[in-house]
Amino acid sequence: MKFFIDTANLDEIREGVELGLVDGVTTNPSLIARENLPFEELIAEICKIVDGPVSAEVISLDAPGMVAEAKKLASIDEKVVIKVPMTAEGLKAVRQLSAAGIKTNVTLIFSANQALLAAKAGASYVSPFVGRLDDIGVNSADLISDILTIFDNYGYASEVIVASVRGPQHVLDSALLGADIATIPLKTIKQLTKHPLTDKGMEQFLADWEKRTQ
Protein backbone atom coordinates (compact mmCIF):
# COMPACT_ATOMS: atom_id res chain seq x y z
CA MET A 1 0.00 0.00 0.00
CA LYS A 2 1.23 3.48 -0.85
CA PHE A 3 0.99 6.50 1.43
CA PHE A 4 0.48 10.00 0.06
CA ILE A 5 0.71 12.95 2.44
CA ASP A 6 -2.30 15.26 2.33
CA THR A 7 -0.84 18.73 2.77
CA ALA A 8 0.65 21.66 0.90
CA ASN A 9 2.98 22.61 3.74
CA LEU A 10 6.60 22.20 2.68
CA ASP A 11 7.90 21.51 6.19
CA GLU A 12 5.32 18.77 6.74
CA ILE A 13 6.17 17.21 3.40
CA ARG A 14 9.88 17.23 4.20
CA GLU A 15 9.21 15.62 7.58
CA GLY A 16 7.08 12.92 5.99
CA VAL A 17 9.73 12.21 3.38
CA GLU A 18 12.41 11.95 6.08
CA LEU A 19 10.31 9.25 7.76
CA GLY A 20 10.56 7.27 4.52
CA LEU A 21 6.80 6.83 4.32
CA VAL A 22 5.69 9.29 1.65
CA ASP A 23 5.08 8.02 -1.88
CA GLY A 24 3.31 11.13 -3.15
CA VAL A 25 1.40 14.29 -2.21
CA THR A 26 -2.18 15.44 -2.54
CA THR A 27 -3.21 19.08 -2.27
CA ASN A 28 -6.48 20.94 -2.66
CA PRO A 29 -7.48 24.62 -2.84
CA SER A 30 -8.10 24.78 0.92
CA LEU A 31 -4.63 23.41 1.71
CA ILE A 32 -2.98 25.68 -0.86
CA ALA A 33 -4.74 28.74 0.60
CA ARG A 34 -3.02 28.18 3.97
CA GLU A 35 0.44 28.62 2.45
CA ASN A 36 2.23 31.83 1.45
CA LEU A 37 3.72 30.89 -1.91
CA PRO A 38 1.88 31.39 -5.22
CA PHE A 39 0.08 28.21 -6.33
CA GLU A 40 2.31 27.18 -9.23
CA GLU A 41 5.50 28.05 -7.36
CA LEU A 42 4.35 25.97 -4.39
CA ILE A 43 3.60 22.95 -6.58
CA ALA A 44 7.04 23.27 -8.16
CA GLU A 45 8.68 23.31 -4.72
CA ILE A 46 6.71 20.25 -3.63
CA CYS A 47 7.85 18.40 -6.75
CA LYS A 48 11.47 19.08 -5.78
CA ILE A 49 10.95 17.37 -2.41
CA VAL A 50 8.91 14.32 -3.37
CA ASP A 51 9.83 11.50 -5.71
CA GLY A 52 6.26 10.63 -6.63
CA PRO A 53 2.91 11.99 -7.87
CA VAL A 54 1.83 15.45 -6.73
CA SER A 55 -1.87 16.21 -7.13
CA ALA A 56 -2.80 19.82 -7.94
CA GLU A 57 -6.46 20.77 -8.32
CA VAL A 58 -8.12 22.89 -10.99
CA ILE A 59 -10.69 25.46 -9.90
CA SER A 60 -12.58 26.04 -13.16
CA LEU A 61 -16.11 24.63 -13.33
CA ASP A 62 -16.30 24.01 -17.07
CA ALA A 63 -14.35 21.45 -19.09
CA PRO A 64 -12.49 23.93 -21.35
CA GLY A 65 -11.35 25.90 -18.33
CA MET A 66 -10.27 22.75 -16.50
CA VAL A 67 -8.28 21.53 -19.48
CA ALA A 68 -6.54 24.88 -19.91
CA GLU A 69 -5.61 24.99 -16.22
CA ALA A 70 -4.52 21.36 -16.30
CA LYS A 71 -2.14 21.85 -19.20
CA LYS A 72 -0.51 24.78 -17.42
CA LEU A 73 -0.13 22.82 -14.18
CA ALA A 74 1.14 19.71 -15.97
CA SER A 75 3.90 21.79 -17.57
CA ILE A 76 5.39 22.50 -14.12
CA ASP A 77 6.74 18.99 -13.64
CA GLU A 78 6.08 15.50 -14.96
CA LYS A 79 5.13 14.44 -11.42
CA VAL A 80 2.04 16.67 -11.42
CA VAL A 81 -1.32 14.89 -11.43
CA ILE A 82 -4.39 17.01 -12.12
CA LYS A 83 -7.18 16.84 -9.57
CA VAL A 84 -10.56 17.23 -11.21
CA PRO A 85 -13.93 17.38 -9.41
CA MET A 86 -16.45 14.58 -9.92
CA THR A 87 -18.89 16.44 -12.15
CA ALA A 88 -20.14 15.97 -15.70
CA GLU A 89 -17.80 18.75 -16.86
CA GLY A 90 -15.01 17.16 -14.86
CA LEU A 91 -15.50 13.87 -16.68
CA LYS A 92 -15.31 15.65 -20.03
CA ALA A 93 -12.03 17.20 -18.95
CA VAL A 94 -10.67 13.86 -17.74
CA ARG A 95 -11.41 12.25 -21.09
CA GLN A 96 -9.54 15.00 -22.94
CA LEU A 97 -6.62 15.06 -20.52
CA SER A 98 -6.29 11.29 -20.60
CA ALA A 99 -6.15 11.39 -24.39
CA ALA A 100 -3.38 14.00 -24.11
CA GLY A 101 -1.36 11.81 -21.75
CA ILE A 102 -1.97 13.96 -18.68
CA LYS A 103 -2.64 12.04 -15.47
CA THR A 104 -5.77 12.86 -13.50
CA ASN A 105 -7.15 12.32 -10.01
CA VAL A 106 -10.93 12.57 -9.79
CA THR A 107 -11.80 13.96 -6.39
CA LEU A 108 -14.88 14.36 -4.19
CA ILE A 109 -16.14 10.86 -4.88
CA PHE A 110 -18.86 9.61 -2.54
CA SER A 111 -20.42 6.70 -4.45
CA ALA A 112 -19.26 3.64 -6.35
CA ASN A 113 -21.15 4.86 -9.42
CA GLN A 114 -19.10 8.05 -9.42
CA ALA A 115 -15.89 6.03 -9.19
CA LEU A 116 -17.05 3.84 -12.08
CA LEU A 117 -17.70 6.87 -14.28
CA ALA A 118 -14.32 8.37 -13.41
CA ALA A 119 -12.51 5.14 -14.27
CA LYS A 120 -14.45 4.82 -17.51
CA ALA A 121 -13.47 8.38 -18.44
CA GLY A 122 -9.82 7.42 -18.05
CA ALA A 123 -8.90 8.74 -14.60
CA SER A 124 -5.47 7.69 -13.36
CA TYR A 125 -6.74 7.88 -9.77
CA VAL A 126 -10.09 8.13 -8.01
CA SER A 127 -10.40 9.65 -4.55
CA PRO A 128 -13.33 8.48 -2.40
CA PHE A 129 -13.74 10.63 0.73
CA VAL A 130 -14.21 8.25 3.66
CA GLY A 131 -14.19 10.66 6.58
CA ARG A 132 -16.96 12.85 5.24
CA LEU A 133 -19.13 9.79 4.62
CA ASP A 134 -18.57 8.49 8.13
CA ASP A 135 -19.46 11.96 9.44
CA ILE A 136 -23.00 11.51 8.09
CA GLY A 137 -23.36 7.92 9.28
CA VAL A 138 -22.48 6.10 6.04
CA ASN A 139 -20.11 3.11 6.26
CA SER A 140 -17.21 4.24 4.11
CA ALA A 141 -15.58 0.79 4.16
CA ASP A 142 -18.49 -0.53 2.09
CA LEU A 143 -17.81 2.16 -0.51
CA ILE A 144 -14.12 1.26 -0.82
CA SER A 145 -14.99 -2.43 -1.10
CA ASP A 146 -17.57 -1.74 -3.82
CA ILE A 147 -15.17 0.41 -5.84
CA LEU A 148 -12.41 -2.19 -5.69
CA THR A 149 -14.83 -4.93 -6.73
CA ILE A 150 -16.09 -2.92 -9.71
CA PHE A 151 -12.57 -2.07 -10.87
CA ASP A 152 -11.56 -5.72 -10.56
CA ASN A 153 -14.67 -6.87 -12.45
CA TYR A 154 -13.87 -4.75 -15.47
CA GLY A 155 -10.10 -4.45 -15.31
CA TYR A 156 -9.98 -0.70 -14.78
CA ALA A 157 -6.45 0.57 -14.19
CA SER A 158 -7.48 3.56 -12.07
CA GLU A 159 -5.86 3.47 -8.63
CA VAL A 160 -7.99 4.09 -5.54
CA ILE A 161 -6.74 6.87 -3.25
CA VAL A 162 -8.61 6.73 0.06
CA ALA A 163 -9.02 10.39 1.05
CA SER A 164 -10.53 12.42 3.89
CA VAL A 165 -8.78 10.12 6.34
CA ARG A 166 -9.62 10.98 9.94
CA GLY A 167 -7.27 8.62 11.76
CA PRO A 168 -5.48 5.26 11.94
CA GLN A 169 -8.67 3.20 11.69
CA HIS A 170 -9.39 4.55 8.22
CA VAL A 171 -5.86 3.59 7.16
CA LEU A 172 -6.26 0.08 8.57
CA ASP A 173 -9.66 -0.38 6.91
CA SER A 174 -8.22 0.74 3.58
CA ALA A 175 -5.26 -1.62 3.85
CA LEU A 176 -7.45 -4.58 4.79
CA LEU A 177 -9.71 -3.92 1.82
CA GLY A 178 -6.77 -3.65 -0.58
CA ALA A 179 -6.95 0.03 -1.53
CA ASP A 180 -3.97 1.16 -3.58
CA ILE A 181 -3.23 4.35 -1.67
CA ALA A 182 -4.25 6.28 1.44
CA THR A 183 -3.61 10.01 1.49
CA ILE A 184 -3.22 11.14 5.06
CA PRO A 185 -2.13 14.17 7.10
CA LEU A 186 1.24 14.14 8.84
CA LYS A 187 -0.57 13.96 12.19
CA THR A 188 -2.13 10.64 11.22
CA ILE A 189 1.16 9.29 9.88
CA LYS A 190 2.65 9.95 13.31
CA GLN A 191 -0.33 8.34 15.03
CA LEU A 192 0.29 5.16 13.06
CA THR A 193 3.68 4.79 14.76
CA LYS A 194 2.16 4.87 18.24
CA HIS A 195 0.78 2.21 20.57
CA PRO A 196 0.57 2.49 24.37
CA LEU A 197 2.16 -0.93 24.84
CA THR A 198 5.10 0.11 22.68
CA ASP A 199 5.64 3.15 24.91
CA LYS A 200 5.27 1.02 28.03
CA GLY A 201 7.72 -1.56 26.69
CA MET A 202 10.30 1.12 25.89
CA GLU A 203 9.98 2.57 29.39
CA GLN A 204 10.51 -0.87 30.92
CA PHE A 205 13.52 -1.64 28.72
CA LEU A 206 15.15 1.68 29.63
CA ALA A 207 14.41 1.24 33.33
CA ASP A 208 15.94 -2.23 33.31
CA TRP A 209 19.01 -0.96 31.46
CA GLU A 210 19.53 1.85 33.95
CA LYS A 211 19.41 -0.66 36.82
CA ARG A 212 22.07 -2.74 35.08
CA THR A 213 24.43 0.21 34.67
CA GLN A 214 24.13 1.47 38.25
Swiss-Prot record:
Belongs to the transaldolase family. Type 3B subfamily. One of its GO terms (molecular function) is transaldolase activity. Pathway: Carbohydrate degradation; pentose phosphate pathway; D-glyceraldehyde 3-phosphate and beta-D-fructose 6-phosphate from D-ribose 5-phosphate and D-xylulose 5-phosphate (non-oxidative stage): step 2/3. InterPro entries: Aldolase_TIM (IPR013785), TAL/FSA (IPR001585), Transaldolase_3B (IPR022999), Transaldolase_3B/F6P_aldolase (IPR004731), Transaldolase_AS (IPR018225), TSA/FSA_arc/bac (IPR033919). This is Probable transaldolase. Transaldolase is important for the balance of metabolites in the pentose-phosphate pathway. Keywords: Cytoplasm, Pentose shunt, Schiff base, Transferase. GO terms for biological process: carbohydrate metabolic process; pentose-phosphate shunt. The keyword Transferase applies. It is found in: Cytoplasm. SUPFAM superfamilies: Aldolase. It comes from Desulfotalea psychrophila (strain LSv54 / DSM 12343). GO terms for cellular component: cytoplasm. It catalyses: D-sedoheptulose 7-phosphate + D-glyceraldehyde 3-phosphate = D-erythrose 4-phosphate + beta-D-fructose 6-phosphate. Its EC number is 2.2.1.2. The active site is at 83 (schiff-base intermediate with substrate). The keyword Transferase applies.
